């Protein structure tokens, strides 16, 4: 039997390429590891109109953002109360003061193994102090790339964004997915809708986005937390970090409506104080500081999206670009519209 070497080589190359493609697709979808120990604790610290979260797993600690400059003593004292002696990682999601503000004070007090930020330079005195105290620890700021991973005890931290360079500082926000056993937490900083969409496009088919607890983006501004992101993430709980009666009008009614439509239980630091989530690897239990307040337990609302039969674009029911009645088709969910081959409207659905 004569063997065609060219066809044989071509066949082998096809198999190799297919195998590589499978690896790229599956490398963020590995089997869930079994976990043991005291679990993962995530504390969304009440720092007013700002962000700050402390994560603890197997005696290791990670701080994501540090509130405003005026929150420095509050954050340092909170870490002291939690028994922090050393930080495995400090993450500055992006360079705005309401995220980096308290981090210089933290780095001045606590030995830290790694510092992450989306940039090493930014035109502000508080960011300069952040860089200074990082240098004082003998560290360099690490700018993580999409897909980078590190461990916090038995918890796995994966960097999912940003996936491009952006001029808008909010869009440079580092996005982290923290998994512990079968549970997961998502932190999106202040990333806005266009960058969210870029990230979802980048990871399409490669990431299981399902999340137990979503730290709602940009203090629940209408610039973030799009229908598309919520459809992918499908969170059980949404934590909003914001200040009472803040000047920005947060939380905005539009993302609150989207969260309610998705059936997300909403927990707000301006109402509940510091919020604590504890995962045992199977389930997440939430408690909060202000015991007299209760979270907003949303029931999935009746969702209707309007599709344009001609353009194959679907819209939120309050969109200004709705089709005529004879050219309209209704969908009961975002996913139903996507499955029918329709694309989301760029204006109302981001």
Task: Tell me the role of every PLM-derived stretch.
Residues 308-324:
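Short aromatic-glycine-(Arg/Gly/Cys) micro-motifs in beta-strand/loop hairpins
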Residues 2-301, 321, 327, 332, ...:
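Non-globular, low-confidence helical/coil segments that flank catalytic cores
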Residues 312, 338-341:
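Residue-level signal for mature regions of secreted extracellular proteins and peptides
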């Amino acid at each position: 039997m004569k063997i065609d070497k060219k066809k044989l080589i071509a066949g082998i190359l096809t198999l190799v390429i297919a195998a590589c493609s499978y690896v790229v697709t599956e490398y963020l979808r590995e089997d869930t590891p079994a976990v043991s120990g005291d679990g993962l604790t995530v504390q969304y610290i009440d720092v007013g109109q700002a962000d700050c979260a402390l994560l603890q797993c197997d005696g290791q600690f990670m701080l994501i953002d540090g509130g405003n400059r005026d929150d420095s003593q509050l954050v340092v004292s909170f870490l002291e109360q939690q028994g922090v002696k050393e930080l495995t990682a400090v993450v500055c999601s992006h360079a705005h003061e309401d995220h980096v503000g308290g981090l210089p004070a933290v780095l001045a007090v606590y030995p830290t193994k790694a510092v992450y930020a989306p940039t090493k330079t930014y035109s502000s005195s508080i960011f300069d102090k952040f860089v200074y105290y990082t240098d004082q620890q003998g560290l360099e700021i690490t700018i993580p790339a999409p897909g980078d991973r590190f461990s916090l005890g038995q918890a796995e931290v994966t960097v999912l964004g940003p996936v491009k360079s952006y001029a808008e500082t909010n869009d440079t926000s580092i996005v982290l997915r923290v998994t512990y056993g079968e549970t997961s937490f998502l932190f999106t900083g202040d990333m806005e809708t266009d960058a969210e969409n870029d990230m979802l496009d980048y990871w399409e088919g490669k990431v299981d986005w399902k999340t137990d607890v979503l730290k709602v983006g940009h203090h629940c501004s209408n610039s973030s937390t799009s229908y598309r992101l919520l459809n992918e993430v499908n969170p059980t709980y949404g934590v909003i970090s914001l200040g009472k009666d803040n000047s920005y009008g947060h939380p905005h009614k539009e993302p609150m409506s989207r969260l309610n439509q998705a059936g997300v239980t909403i927990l707000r630091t301006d109402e509940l104080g510091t919020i604590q989530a504890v995962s045992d690897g199977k389930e997440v239990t939430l408690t909060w500081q202000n015991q007299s307040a209760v979270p907003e337990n949303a029931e999935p609302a009746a969702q209707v999206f309007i599709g344009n039969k001609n353009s194959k674009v679907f819209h939120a029911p309050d969109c200004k670009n709705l089709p005529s009645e004879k050219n309209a088709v209704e969908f009961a969910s975002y996913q139903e519209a996507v499955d029918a081959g329709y694309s989301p409207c760029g204006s109302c659905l981001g």
